[in-house]
């Protein structure tokens, strides 16, 4: 197995849905199914924060979501937890700057997909040199979902990464909605990652479909 090609990775990032049980006000499996029907291209399991599942409940829930993703041939990525990703044979893992370092993650994960959150050019270059397949750049807009976020960068921060010669696939993160998706893509992102724009939408299907349309229109 070889590492994922850049073109394929770029396409997978178009509509990147991130979710845990505590991000939904209704059945998370129903939300994910609607989102998959609507056109989610990659999914990240992020079970963190107040009211999140732990232990066996967390593992069982992850497996249920993974099974659903597999039915749609949509990659299932685990946030932070490399051991869980290995246990589940997930398609990949996403790590932040405060999580396990990219070098040891790449050693453990082999050729699986690895995404890294990057806030500076230095972080981005280090991640790429040590095996990141894509970067999560942000927060682009203010967000209420993640409490521990860095300073908001705006689309200028994203454009700056491209201006500095960062060519790997990038997904925009933080406060992204249907209304501001076009600006994120036009600034240089290959796709948008969202939590509440889908998880709290009246119709996860409609919200995902509109996000997908905006991305494709703006690329």
Swiss-Prot record:
Domain of life: Bacteria
Pathway: Cofactor biosynthesis; thiamine diphosphate biosynthesis; thiamine phosphate from 4-amino-2-methyl-5-diphosphomethylpyrimidine and 4-methyl-5-(2-phosphoethyl)-thiazole: step 1/1
Gene Ontology biological process terms in this record: thiamine biosynthetic process; thiamine diphosphate biosynthetic process
UniProt-annotated binding residues for 4-amino-2-methyl-5-(diphosphooxymethyl)pyrimidine: 44-48, 79, 117, 146
UniProt-annotated binding residues for Mg(2+): 80, 99
Cofactor(s) for this UniProt protein: Mg(2+)
Pfam family, one: TMP-TENI
Name this polypeptide is given: Thiamine-phosphate synthase
Source organism of this protein record: Bacillus cereus (strain ATCC 14579 / DSM 31 / CCUG 7414 / JCM 2152 / NBRC 15305 / NCIMB 9373 / NCTC 2599 / NRRL B-3711)
Taxonomic lineage from the root: Bacteria, Bacillati, Bacillota, Bacilli, Bacillales
């Amino acid at each position: 197995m070889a590492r994922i090609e850049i073109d394929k990775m770029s396409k997978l990032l178009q509509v990147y849905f991130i979710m845990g049980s505590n991000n939904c006000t209704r059945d998370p499996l129903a939300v994910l199914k609607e989102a998959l029907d609507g056109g989610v291209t990659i999914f990240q399991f992020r079970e963190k924060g107040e009211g999140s599942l732990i232990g066996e409940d967390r593992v069982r829930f992850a497996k249920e979501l993974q099974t659903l993703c597999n039915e749609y041939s949509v990659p299932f990525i685990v946030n932070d937890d490399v051991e869980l990703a290995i246990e589940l044979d997930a398609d990949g893992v996403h790590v932040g700057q405060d999580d396990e370092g990219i070098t040891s993650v790449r050693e453990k994960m082999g050729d699986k997909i690895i995404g890294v959150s990057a806030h500076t050019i230095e972080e981005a270059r280090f991640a790429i040199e040590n095996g990141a397949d894509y970067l999560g750049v942000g927060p682009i807009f203010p967000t209420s979902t993640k409490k521990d976020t860095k300073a908001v960068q705006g689309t200028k921060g994203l454009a700056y990464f491209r201006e500095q010669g960062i060519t790997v696939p990038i997904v925009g993160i933080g406060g992204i909605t249907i209304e501001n998706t076009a600006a994120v893509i036009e600034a240089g992102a290959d796709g948008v990652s969202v939590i509440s724009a889908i998880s709290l939408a009246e119709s996860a299907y409609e919200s995902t479909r509109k996000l997908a349309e905006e991305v494709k229109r703006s690329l």
